[in-house]
Amino acid sequence: MAVISMKQLLEAGVHFGHQTRRWNPKMARYIFTERNGIYIIDLQKTVKKVEEAYNFVRELAQDGGKILFVGTKKQAQESVKEEAERTGHYFINQRWLGGTLTNFTTIKKRTARLAELKRMENDGTFAVLPKKEVIVLRKEMDRLEKFLGGIAHMDKLPDALFVIDPRKERIAVAEARKLGIPIVAIVDTNCDPDEIDYVIPGNDDAIRAVKLLTAKMADALLEGNQGTEQQATTTA
């Protein structure tokens, strides 16, 4: 059975690309036609590419790999958080802080600080500190939670990235490429597919399209995790 159907893709509007004047010629091979000044993505190719990405993600999870979901545009924020939490993987849905991957030791210090502040809140330390100091600490904690909460438990670099709109997330893409971390991405008609290891040609601006494709990658992770559990049972 196919991982995803043409009907699902059509209903979610995955086939709608950008205006013809805003395009990357490298995406030509994934474009079916042009309609009313908008490029229409070839969904037969999308079906095939979703399957390739799904298989990669499933096998990665089966090997115990972890994925970092990245989507900071408004249309992606909720799906990225939901699906990462559903699968127990990581996410960044606010702003990509430069050096998140390439300067990971510094990022780890910030997530350690977040953990420390949460501990202080939970163990009653805040209750005995001066009110003004607590206000400052809470502000710091909220800011760290906002930008780094989704990677608070990421103690090593991720094994792959799932990116929504690699053009917007170009810093994340550049960092992953520099470190040789594979990238799976929803790539619209205005993006450069050559920077992506597993291209999913599709609409990165419609909430339904983003939700469908992000959920599909999350399903692949869950299926892969089941395989890991089965292997562990067999070994035991």
UniProtKB/Swiss-Prot annotation:
Entries under CDD domains matching the protein: RPS2 (cd01425)
Keywords per UniProt: Ribonucleoprotein, Ribosomal protein
S-S bridge residues: none
Keyword Transmembrane helix tagged: no
GO MF term set: structural constituent of ribosome
Superkingdom field: Bacteria
InterPro entries recorded: Ribosomal_uS2, Ribosomal_uS2_bac/mit/plastid, Ribosomal_uS2_CS, Ribosomal_uS2_flav_dom_sf
A Pfam entry, by short name: Ribosomal_S2
This protein's record includes keyword Ribosomal protein: yes
Gene Ontology biological-process entries: translation
Any one GO CC term of the record: cytosolic small ribosomal subunit
Family: Belongs to the universal ribosomal protein uS2 family.
Protein name: Small ribosomal subunit protein uS2
Organism expressing this protein natively: Brevibacillus brevis (strain 47 / JCM 6285 / NBRC 100599)
